[in-house]
């Protein structure tokens, strides 16, 4: 028998979990969505899953643990909840792809280090701001050392649900750590702003990068352009508003050239409105990571009898 699909489940039926459900249905790859689990029987996400014939559960993680065929679990709950979920999933031999800022496993950003942690039991997708800005900081750091990176992420207030609002502190800490650990900056800072404007704005990010020393401007611009193209393979609405700008500025390390990048992320509109690019980039990254984990599992598990 040829095994060609890996069963996966989504834990959390809010905005992120529901958008991820539609992405997995649209581009399943080597994955089969076997269950969507939440805790609110009246949630729109569970109702939509039932309407399209996907099994659902309202007892949270319990139904996932009870099905031994589910190998990969996308956790779209909250950082606090994932602390408990991570332990249970590991104890039951499941792979956790964590869409919360809990950071119980190594950080993963698809175009940067997607293949480095395929034996991990738990990987963390950092934050929406991290998925958006870490690739650009890494694009600089791979061609010249980076002393400092700072990102300011502005998202539509309407795109920030209760889970996002509860995780603000975790967002800033985890994003900054990701800019350092994955982006390659020696030091970093992250800031998020919820903009109540109507109509809602697209996700916008401003990234400041202070290189350690001299660098070739054209090499940096080419590296950034290649990274944008790499991210666009799974987030088509990911785009720079202009070419990177390089300005001489006063910094804590003296007069230095500062690389400034203005980034916009438009969502695909699978479930969430297109202005919610901050959520869309998380679910798109999750699907991308899940796809590689599924392929890796199948490469080890496929048998012919």
Swiss-Prot record:
Keywords: Aromatic hydrocarbons catabolism, NAD, Oxidoreductase. It catalyses: acetaldehyde + NAD(+) + CoA = acetyl-CoA + NADH + H(+). Transmembrane segments: none annotated. GO terms for biological process: catabolic process. SUPFAM superfamilies: Glyceraldehyde-3-phosphate dehydrogenase-like, C-terminal domain, NAD(P)-binding Rossmann-fold domains. HAMAP family: Ac_ald_DH_ac. This is Acetaldehyde dehydrogenase. It comes from Chloroflexus aurantiacus (strain ATCC 29366 / DSM 635 / J-10-fl). The lineage of its organism: Bacteria, Bacillati, Chloroflexota, Chloroflexia, Chloroflexales.
